[in-house]
Amino acid sequence: MNEFRTRLAETRPDEASASGAGGLDFASDGQGGDLPEAALVTGGAGFIGSHLAGRLAIDGDVRVLDDLSTGDRDAVPEAATLIQGDVTDYQSVVRAAEGVDVIFHLAAVVSVEESVSDPVETNLTNVDGTVNVLEAAREVGARVVFASSAAVYGPPETLPVTVDEPQTPRSPYGASKAAADAYVRAYEASYDVPTVALRYFNVYGRGQRGPYSGVIDAFLGRALDGEPLVVHGDGEQTRDFVHVSDVVRANLAAATTDDTGTAYNVGTGRSVTVNELASIVAAAADVDAEVRH
């Protein structure tokens, strides 16, 4: 099973890009020794955060701030220092950030369903927690690279989505990310805190887990269990899927870019239908899976 999951995780419909005001240079991904010497990753025990912390830990001093409410302690790289704490507690954040060059802020309520059931907690973590991170960065003199989301746009008016697309979020999650995204850019404009907001599209890869881990993981689990892949509707609805390793590269590029105070979309720029995705999953799992609408 792990072999099949790995095979799918390495399957990419297209190479990713980060589009915005001039774009990010993905060649500047830390391979040339330009990684920050000391970094803090909030939410570093989660899916994307643990991948990022693992890359940063190769060459530098990495701290992970995570309350482990949804993160996995075992996902934190051995070379990283785990600080168990919550971004809603300012003192925990500023202590963890002391002496770092960059704060990669990924800690968040990430489930749309959870945000609908508890919008107050979502706002506390995603908005107030982000302001705490920005204040800590202001105090210690660090850059902030913020994990925003394509959910800030709501249903897109045009494809591919550009960073200038009107923001009409349709969930408390999307609204909280839009508010935090605005705070991130406002802190650079108001306080000269260098910031970059990265608006992730649908991220997939190894280590993704949980009830809201995404359609790719759900399809793969059913394929490996010999069950039909259930597609809701006609299957022609589209998503932009981006591999977690490309998201890591975007974060590393954002840590060194001179073009701060702005936002970038992180995706492939290509829409994949759910029907196409079902075929990709079946091929990756090497099974003749039934697709049921």
Predicted segments with their positions:
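C-terminal substrate-binding subdomain of Rossmann-fold SDR/epimerase-dehydratase oxidoreductases
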Residues: R206, A223-H293
